[in-house]
């Protein structure tokens, strides 16, 4: 089983390292042919305008969409969540998403870099207590479609982790925590995938 991490820009190395600590074969993905034989794909945090532009420039958008629509697990963290969203609100200039997940997302919802924070989250899908979530210029989910499951909210009710079938999205950066439970959860999604 091989899990790819989109390596065009952003925090891809941290995801690779976390996956490898779990014994998963993790590979960097920069070209469409590198999507072959994957059991899952992570779209990391970074700069959403840059990542979405490069997805289309390098011819990755269509094959990623096709694989996701055929059931391959795809997880977007922070900017990756923005990439997966069907709709964006607020300043969306320069961002063309993959329009895969039935969510409306607001970019940079918590402010600038200096407004970054950590929070302990109760996550439905994870056992073992609260999860330490790192938010850096994070988006938030404003609205979900009928089939989207909300996995975690901040104490004020803000949705920050969601799943729709084979699609997973988090506003925060699990790869920047020492806690590997979210990655373990995604590895299990990848193991369950039957192409």
UniProtKB/Swiss-Prot annotation:
Task: Look up the record and name the pathway of this protein.
Answer: Cofactor biosynthesis; pyridoxal 5'-phosphate biosynthesis
Where's the active site on this chain?
Answer: 78, 173, 175
Annotated binding of L-glutamine, by residue: 46-48, 107, 136-137
Is this entry keyworded Hydrolase? yes
Q: Which GO terms describe its cellular component?
A: cytosol; glutaminase complex
- Please provide, alphabetically and separated by semicolons, the GO molecular function terms listed in this UniProt record: glutaminase activity; pyridoxal 5'-phosphate synthase (glutamine hydrolysing) activity
The record ties this protein, via InterPro entries, to: Class_I_gatase-like, PdxT/SNO, PdxT/SNO_CS
> Sorted alphabetically, which PROSITE patterns does this protein's record hold?
PDXT_SNO_1 (PS01236), PDXT_SNO_2 (PS51130)
Keyword field: Glutamine amidotransferase, Hydrolase, Lyase, Pyridoxal phosphate
Set out the biological process GO terms recorded for this chain's protein: glutamine catabolic process; pyridoxal phosphate biosynthetic process; pyridoxine metabolic process
Question: What EC number(s) does the entry state?
Answer: 4.3.3.6, 3.5.1.2
Q: Which domain of life is it from?
A: Bacteria
Q: Which Pfam families match?
A: SNO
The catalysed reaction is: aldehydo-D-ribose 5-phosphate + D-glyceraldehyde 3-phosphate + L-glutamine = pyridoxal 5'-phosphate + L-glutamate + phosphate + 3 H2O + H(+); L-glutamine + H2O = L-glutamate + NH4(+)
Q: Where are the transmembrane segments?
A: none
Record note on quaternary structure: In the presence of PdxS, forms a dodecamer of heterodimers. Only shows activity in the heterodimer.
Which family, according to the similarity comment?
Answer: Belongs to the glutaminase PdxT/SNO family.
State the function annotated in the UniProt record. Catalyzes the hydrolysis of glutamine to glutamate and ammonia as part of the biosynthesis of pyridoxal 5'-phosphate. The resulting ammonia molecule is channeled to the active site of PdxS.
Output this protein's name: Pyridoxal 5'-phosphate synthase subunit PdxT
State the organism's lineage.
Bacteria, Bacillati, Chloroflexota, Dehalococcoidia, Dehalococcoidales
